[in-house]
Curated annotation (Swiss-Prot):
Binding, pyridoxal 5'-phosphate: 106-107, 176, 204, 233
Catalytic activity: 6-carboxyhexanoyl-[ACP] + L-alanine + H(+) = (8S)-8-amino-7-oxononanoate + holo-[ACP] + CO2
Gene name in the database record: bioF
Keyword Transferase belongs to the record: yes
Provenance organism: Pseudomonas aeruginosa (strain LESB58)
Role: Catalyzes the decarboxylative condensation of pimeloyl-[acyl-carrier protein] and L-alanine to produce 8-amino-7-oxononanoate (AON), [acyl-carrier protein], and carbon dioxide.
Cofactor requirement: pyridoxal 5'-phosphate
Protein name, as recorded: 8-amino-7-oxononanoate synthase
Modified sites of kind N6-(pyridoxal phosphate)lysine: 236
Amino acid sequence: MSFDLASRLASRRAEDLYRQRPLLESAQGPDVVVDGQPLLAFCSNDYLGLANHPEVIAALRAGAERWGVGGGASHLVVGHSGPHHELELALAEFTGRPRALLFSTGYMANLGAVTALVGKGDTVLEDRLNHASLLDAGLLSGARFSRYLHNDPASLAARLDKAEGNTLVVTDGVFSMDGNLADLPALAAVAQARGAWLMVDDAHGFGPLGASGGGIVEHFGLGQEQVPVLIGTLGKGFGTAGAFVAGSEELIETLIQYARPYIYTTSQPPAVACATLKSLELLRRESWRRQHLAALIARFRHGAEALGLTLMDSFTPIQPILVGGSRQAVALAGMLRARGIMVGAIRPPTVPANSARLRVTLSAAHSEAQVDRLLEALGESWRQLSSSLLAEIEAEEGDDA
């Protein structure tokens, strides 16, 4: 029997779920060129505006001149260079933990941490809305895998009462499609009371959250005792690439010995680690970026609510606008693009059925005037979409008459 890939692709198209890759023809930033069209972008995860920072670029250039381009080998052979080691030390100090370990991607960090810590005879409990990489890690670990109700400590407690072996509770810090925060104090209390470890993937929290950009753990004033396993990515708030796990000496040594995505892959280019060291310095030093970003978020929410748009409970840079149907979300994104604004339409299976949305993301690189331009375009596009839907309903009623 042959693979019928054509019918699978046709089904995706028919359901308005077909994904296509926009071609970026400029550097990252608010003003981009995509598929030949100049656009004002509100869909990047470059929350602090560091991806195209001149000092970060200079650090990358200097790093390449000193260390070359490729990592050359895995960390355990001859690929663990000076910049990698220096960055791990800096990230450990930044997170207030004894050690940190670099991974090439956030997906690999999540997969490596979960599969190294639990296996057959153990238990993994995850939030239902966790990132796909966390869910995949739980399934691939071989441990007993279950999902608790979103951000619900009582649901977690009920599942913990049935857990077996070593138990790992896993949650996003900031949920990437909703923008809300995990209730870490409550989740940590429930996990600790039952002898489980809590692992937090704070991909979207590092940079925007916390007084010094230390993410959700700093935001809630928690430490290693409450959150033994802390994951961070470097391609969002840091503006570079890669990821890390921070924790105890024993945790990091365990990952070095058992995390297959760490052991069996070439290290990231050393120059990227040089760039990240500079971006970490800027992230900590330039607190105005977080302050400006917070002001933009408040400005956007006030304007969007005045337009009657349905927002979610988020004070993070992720500001979803609930639309409902996939076709309507795609249409609204297209109307914005016709007005020179780029916002991503998020559809199932990334989000639950009938909860398609526009995922607006704000950056410290945006200006107040650019946010106002987005709001103006949203108002015009929303009215256009409403008129189109009304016309379709009237046409259908006419056909039924």
